[in-house]
Each structure stands twice: as structure tokens, then as C-alpha cells.
Amino acid sequence: YDKSSKGIDYLKKNFSVEICSNISDAVKESDLVVIASPLSSYKEILLSIRTSLKENVILTDTGSAKKEVNKIISNLNLKNVNWIASHPIAGTEYSGPEAGFASLFKNRWCIISVDKKKVAEDKIKSLENFWSKLGSKTKRMTFEDHDYVLSLTSHLPHAVAYSIVRSAINKEDKFKDDVIQYSAGG
């Protein structure tokens, strides 16, 4: 399933895939459902599929924030669903099926976050196996730890660039303008 007609056209042209026009139909018999869309669309997607999810399904995602998504999942009170958050640290600046390539996950980390009181260990291992077969190395973290660690790593390059620019502004240096112009891509 893909909302984008451009994405669907690309998939049909380049791969032998079955495409559903209805998201509820797409998940009906699935043992594993992966939400790979912008975080802002999660609630809408979950509301659309919640009555169609197979009992005991593994539900995961590929998003970069976990604590808020976990709240959405909890508030929807999904029954007989194994919610295990995933965050593959892979990809490029591009999105959609066109941005995929065979080695996308090879030797890349995938962080798994789960409430072990709500999900059986065999379900967690099954999802870890899924990511491993795609080439990923998996690491478990709590929802909170994930968000803390990733907020530091994703914001760190911006903080460094800001520090460089700030230092240049405070100096009387012949390269001051060049440092400011070329920091963080200009």
C-alpha cells in the first residue's frame, strides 16, 4: 500500500509486487505490519487499520521518535497487537520507494524499543530476525533512551556548525566571512 500514485507507478514498473488500494485490506492477513511513513501520519494510519489487524500481529515502524508514537499506540488501546518500535538508522535524504536500494540496511543499526511486559520475547526476536535478514544489526533501547540518544546524535552536527559560526562571528579573522558562508552547507 502507498498513498502516492507516483510511488505506486514506480513500484509497478520496477518490481513484481502486489499493491492494495485500501490500507485495511493490505494488513488483514499480515503477521508483520511495518509503518514506513512520516510520523505525522501515524495516528491516521493506525485509526485506519486498527480493526483490520490480525490477532497477535507484530506492529512496527521506521520512525525516528518513539515516546510520542508509543503514547498514540497506548491511547488507541489496540487489542492483541504486539507493538515493537523500530528505528533503522539507514537511508538517505530522499524518500519513497525510489530511494530504496538493495544494501540500504546492510551493517546499519536498527534500534528496537518495546515494553517487555506487553510483548512476548519470541515476538521481539522475530522482529530482530526480520531486520537481521535485511542486513541490520539490532540494539534494544527503552523508548525514552532511544529518543534521548537520537536527539543528541541528530542534533549534534547542527550544534557543531552553530559553534563554528559563533566562533567565527566573535573573531577578527580574514577567514571570518568564508567560515560563516560555508558552515553547514552555507
What are these regions (language model features)?
Residues 17, 30, 56, 107-108, ...:
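Short, well-ordered alpha-helix to beta-strand connector turns
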Residues 1-15:
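NAD(P)-binding Rossmann-fold cofactor-contacting core
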Residues 104-186:
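Internal alpha-helical scaffold of NAD(P)-dependent oxidoreductase catalytic cores
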Residues 18-23, 139-141:
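Short acidic-hydrophobic, aromatic-tinged amphipathic segments that line or gate anion-handling sites
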Residues 23-53, 57-58:
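Rossmann-like NAD(P)-binding element
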Residues 1, 61-62, 86, 113, ...:
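Generic beta-sheet signal
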Residues 3-4, 37-38, 62:
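Short beta->alpha hinge that forms the Motif I/post-I loop of the SAM-binding pocket
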Residues 45-98:
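Rossmann-like NAD(P)(H) cofactor-binding subdomain of soluble oxidoreductases
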